[in-house]
Amino acid sequence: MPKIRHLAMICMDPEKLAKFYCEVFEMKEVTRATRNGRTNVFLTDGYINLALLSQKAEGKANGLNHFGFHVEDSDVIAERLKQWDIVGPSDRPPDRVYAEQRATDPEGNMYDIAEGGFDRDLATPKKTKAPVTA
């Protein structure tokens, strides 16, 4: 059964929010990525991951951007989407290492579809990533 494994929030100061969630809720930092001078921080509670994404669209609201499902077989999900007359899912850019695809629900809410996810070796190609053992 597909499982929600991450939420992504748009925020003004991802590093400050990361510190807040780590100190108050004991979340752990998984990684961070800086692109075009903006830093995104990725946290986990060991079960759900929280992506704190830097606001880059001036005047746009902060808040929930998308959520992500971990699935065993993305082709099965694609077939189910067709039954709902939903085109997609679309492949994510290769530099987006935590999810292979993105789609929307009937109201346009975005979600990621990943056969891998945050619990994998980032050096291994997508769809072949083995879980990281601690």
Where is each model-derived feature located?
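Core segments of cupin and vicinal oxygen chelate
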Residues: P2, A8-L50
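Vicinal oxygen chelate
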Residues: K3-M12, V41-T44, A57-A134, ...
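Conserved beta-strand in the GNAT
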Residues: A51-L53, D112
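N-terminal beta-strand motif that seeds the catalytic metal site of vicinal oxygen chelate
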Residues: M1-A18, L64-F67, G117-A134
